[in-house]
């Protein structure tokens, strides 16, 4: 396997090329990319957890250090001012020496406000990308060059196409997340609470709650009906029926985003439905290829949902085509089939059709779909179908012409289990689709 250092060297070359093109298109001399700053809680001296600017960590795997700056022009070696204060109150990260530091000029920055004296004197044609526009103004950056939309759209569009370095990092993140999912299932089987299952997950992945790329969804029984449930009960339920875990990991700034659902018992209708959703998810992935719209796969899965609703007699006396046409599948899968994945969990440019930022919205019928792109080699996406029994979505169907087709008795029997979601992370290649999750044997 090619070393991470070698892959990173090629990664930087790709970013340099993209930067040259962006600077030429928008007539800028360089980009000043800010890692970000700590922000205090209102009326307090305690900061919120630091989250790095994703455009910064695209260049360097520095994710925990505020007040860092990158100057890139697409030609010269990227210059990183790394914040290195003298501070006995807080931990100070040492000046990095790692696989990537040969390709970046790393300079210590002892004072957060000292960057102004280190930048080129002429800054009128430098673009700033970062979360603190007022800092850019203080440095003399032109207001029109602060987070310029055209530049950001251009960079976002090409972030969709992962370099081999990025894919290597994402495969490592998968390994960590898979370890966490296995530990969490074991904790569930042993009767632990959501809170304790989450601790087991974090321990297995080597993450803290502030390190994971998104808040873990650890949902037992009815809690799986809340799509982004993050409460974490401290007490285990009296009866364990089901467990939905949506949890990821991060490696060098790149995310994994996996979901699995387990039934406490293996011989009930819910367990069979979990198996069937899993089988249909794998069958859909087997059909995926470059050159097809991601929207098509979302539409295809609604056909598969209809098949399962009919098979399990949740909807009766109606064709699968009619179910989809009249959106009877909608309340059972109210979210999109997935989303782009990378430096961010819901990665950027899901709706961009070109490097000018042309936007193609999700279909009106499925507004929560997060991607309308034509699949191309290098893209990484999640495939995460589900079936849920959510009363607020089912309630409107209890009246009206279609109510008679809903097997309400069956639905009531399944509601205590609440929901099913199965999520893998896939890479689009020229002639195949790589399932990073299943390659690690996560069932």
UniProtKB/Swiss-Prot annotation:
Gene Ontology terms describing biological process: proteolysis
Binding site for Mn(2+) 2: 246, 257, 423
A single GO molecular function term of this UniProt record: phosphoric triester hydrolase activity
Note on how the cofactor is bound: Binds 2 manganese ions per subunit.
GO CC term, one of those recorded: cytosol
Enzyme Commission code(s) on record: 3.4.13.9
Binding, Mn(2+) 1: 257, 339, 384, 423
Catalytic activity: Xaa-L-Pro dipeptide + H2O = an L-alpha-amino acid + L-proline
PROSITE patterns noted in UniProt: PROLINE_PEPTIDASE
Protein role: Splits dipeptides with a prolyl residue in the C-terminal position.
HAMAP family per record: X_Pro_dipeptid
Protein name: Xaa-Pro dipeptidase
Source species: Shigella boydii serotype 18 (strain CDC 3083-94 / BS512)
Lineage, broadest ranks: Bacteria, Pseudomonadati, Pseudomonadota, Gammaproteobacteria, Enterobacterales
